[in-house]
């Protein structure tokens, strides 16, 4: 697998700010280290090369931000959009309904589904873009 296009801290902070501007919520980064940890996880999966693919790495972005809770508000939104942006940057298009996506992220945040389940959700709701 070729090296993916990664989401960095600046990208995640910009996404978070934009999502708060669009949908409201309290601004602010609660813990930079938790954000950095969430953003490093997909890259570690890639380096370990133990079967992780683009979908698993997108899940790692989403789960990392949702569960680490690095922001004061908007962690689920930011985690979801970060994962989807990662997919888009790497040649995939997300096709699930807004309702299905929201439900999956809420279940992930609540612990009702695990990362493998969320990856399965993504796999059935992304298509590879034509080159």
Segments and roles (model prediction):
Residues 1-131:
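FIC/Doc superfamily catalytic core
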């Amino acid at each position: 697998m070729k090296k993916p296009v990664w989401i960095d801290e600046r990208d995640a902070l910009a996404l978070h700010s934009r999502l708060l501007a669009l949908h409201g919520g309290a601004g602010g980064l609660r813990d930079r280290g938790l954000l950095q940890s969430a953003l490093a996880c997909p890259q570690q999966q890639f380096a370990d090369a133990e079967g992780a693919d683009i979908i698993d790495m997108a899940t790692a972005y989403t789960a990392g931000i949702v569960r680490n809770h690095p922001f004061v508000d908007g962690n689920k939104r930011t985690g979801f959009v970060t994962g989807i942006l990662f997919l888009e940057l790497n040649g995939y298009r997300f096709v699930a309904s807004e309702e299905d996506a929201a439900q999956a992220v809420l279940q992930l945040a609540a612990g009702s589904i695990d990362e493998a389940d969320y990856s399965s959700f993504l796999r059935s709701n992304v298509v590879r873009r034509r080159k």
